[in-house]
A protein has these predicted regions:
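Phosphate- and other anionic-substrate recognition elements at nucleic-acid/protein interfaces
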Residues: 1-158, 270
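Phosphate-backbone recognition surface of nucleic-acid-processing proteins
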Residues: 29, 34, 210-285, 289, ...
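A residue-level signal for conserved active-site and pocket-lining positions in enzyme catalytic cores
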Residues: 101, 135, 261, 286, ...
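Short helix-capping/linker segments at secondary-structure and domain boundaries
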Residues: 108-113, 142-143, 216-219, 268-274, ...
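Generic structural signal for well-ordered, non-transmembrane alpha-helical segments
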Residues: 133-136, 140, 165-175, 298
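Helix-hairpin-helix/helix-loop-helix acidic hairpins
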Residues: 148-205, 214, 269-272
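Short hydrophobic alpha-helical segments that form membrane-spanning helices or hydrophobic packing faces
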Residues: 206-212, 293-294
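Low-complexity, acidic/Ser/Thr- and charged residue-rich accessory regions of DNA metabolism proteins
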Residues: 241-242, 279-326
């Protein structure tokens, strides 16, 4: 990073965003173009704005600053929370979130990754996945409604026909969207898609989702960063000198990625040799199958990351090579 960098910690919500700069002052602006211009007036060529990934709320400001040649980093909320918990033990609870993000930026400056936004193809892929998920939820709701209606003594034929038409329509739309997604992913990541898809337990649809949701795995330098992004890393709570409570996954990461991996784990625990060994070993220790499946999710993600970074295709006989890349 540039010497004498002027850092800004930015906490963004739907309507406003709070800012803390190196001068210690606090600002609050509207999360719209008028607020963006006021934020820009605080910056110069040595400024570096750091914010959390907040779904979609951060995107407009991040793109605005990026287009104005201001350095931007969009960090995993879990990374910031852990930093505060582990290293800033003297931090006071009355500090604003933007101030804590500022302190995170200053103390982890060498680890901050510059944000470059998404390409038009990546944006289109993300939008397709979002709409596909919406249609999938609607399909589930309609199927439940159809089942309820058909279980009635005298179901209305018009209602039944309407529900079936809607289900057919949604299925056709989902199929079209997934075909479009496949074409887009192949444009930039044909080789990566083939490699990720070679992992037992990860099918084509899941491979596409993994590639899109991780930005082709390019946003991560370590597998541990990727697992943290997915919210699969354990979180242990501790208060004072009290005994630590049972660890659990954070669930603060990308829910869509975590759900995709969990569905893959159900197959991987049977057909992926390394995953099966992990699953069987954990269950044999008396731990729950859910804990074992989470471990399988971690393993799958690490395998995908290793293949993405190494250029290798999955081969159970080369597990040692893959492990060295984890």
């Amino acid at each position: 990073m540039i010497k004498n960098t002027n850092y800004f910690g930015i906490d963004i919500s739907k309507n406003v965003f709070d800012v803390t700069g190196s001068d210690g002052k606090h600002y609050q602006f509207k999360n719209d173009i008028s607020g963006f211009k006021k934020m820009l007036s605080l910056t110069n060529e040595s400024s570096h704005c750091v914010m959390e990934s907040t779904g979609v709320y951060h995107l407009r400001l991040a793109y605005y600053l990026y287009e104005k040649a201001i350095a931007v980093s969009v960090e995993n909320p879990l990374s910031i929370k852990r930093f505060i918990q582990m290293r800033l033990t003297k931090i006071k609870t009355d500090k604003s979130d933007s101030q804590m993000i500022y302190e995170y930026a200053v103390n982890t400056s060498d680890e901050l990754r510059l944000w470059k936004g998404q390409s038009p193809t990546q944006i289109a892929c993300s939008q397709i996945i979002s709409l596909t998920n919406l249609y999938t939820k609607q399909t589930t709701a309609l199927k439940n409604k159809l089942q309820t209606e058909e279980s009635m003594g005298s179901p209305c034929s018009q209602v039944i026909r309407s529900l079936k038409r809607s289900l057919k329509y949604l299925k056709n739309e989902i199929d079209k969207l997934e075909d479009s997604l496949l074409k887009l992913v192949k444009q930039d990541n044909q080789d990566l898609l083939t490699r990720v898809e070679s992992i037992p337990g990860i099918g084509r649809r899941s491979s596409m989702l993994l590639i899109v949701l991780t930005g082709g795995f390019e946003r991560f330098n370590k597998a541990s960063e990727l697992c943290s992004f997915a919210g699969l890393t354990p979180m242990i709570r501790q208060s004072g000198s009290s005994i630590r409570s049972r660890s659990r996954i954070s669930k603060m990461g990308n829910r869509r990625l975590r759900k995709t991996l969990f569905m893959c784990s159900l197959s991987a625990k049977k057909y992926n040799k390394a995953c099966k060994e992990i699953f069987d070993r954990i269950v044999a220790k008396g731990k729950s199958k859910k804990v074992a499946l989470i471990a399988v999710c971690n393993k799958l993600l690490k395998q995908a990351f290793a293949l993405a970074k190494s250029g290798l295709k999955y081969d159970r006989n080369y597990r040692s090579v893959l492990n060295n890349l984890n």
